[in-house]
Amino acid sequence: MSRKCLVITVSGLAGSGTTTLCRNLSRYYGFKHIYAGLIFRQMAKEMGMSLQQFQEYAEMHPEIDREVDRRQIEAAEDCNVVIEGRLAGWMVKEADLKVWLEAPIQVRAQRVARREGISIEEAFMQIAEREMQNRKRYLNLYGIDINDRSIYDLVINTFKWGPDGVFAIVKAAIDHLYPDGDAGSGANPGNKS
């Protein structure tokens, strides 16, 4: 498939830094940012459920996941987009760059606690429960093992590198794809003519 623009997927578990990276990429390159987690949260709100309740509801209603995935795949048809979601790398098969971010669960729990205004212990328990539910659901629904990182072009430990380091690594990869500095301008990295 010949593409005249860049499509990047950024995936990772809760608190790994996916939103921070996507916002930085969006600001720097002017990419449109599609966030699967926000879609999921909006759907929970529309149904009057907490995120945890909606997570449990989604386990029994596969149409929820399929709708989120449909929106991600649809978004990948746009030019110059960064798509954020745990399964984005799996769903957007022809992405130009697939990134997985990770960090130790203790670090992720601290980040989530700070973001959500809850205790670290509560965040840790929520993350552990959510990851167990998601892994089971993704295996049952799609046959995808969320722990399989083999499809990703980059796997980055955000605890080790921090937001600036992570951005620099991904920027270097994008600049390699677009050596003439044309990322976001609609140029095709494989076509030098």
Curated annotation (Swiss-Prot):
Its main location: cytoplasm. GO terms for cellular component: cytoplasm. Keywords: ATP-binding, Cytoplasm, Kinase, Nucleotide-binding, Transferase. GO terms for biological process: pyrimidine nucleotide metabolic process. It comes from Thermococcus sibiricus (strain DSM 12597 / MM 739). InterPro entries: Cyt_kin_arch (IPR011892), Cytidylate_kinase_dom (IPR011994), P-loop_NTPase (IPR027417). It comes from the Archaea. One of its GO terms (molecular function) is ATP binding. Gene3D superfamilies: P-loop containing nucleotide triphosphate hydrolases (3.40.50.300). It is an enzyme of class 2 (transferase). This is Cytidylate kinase. It is found in: Cytoplasm.
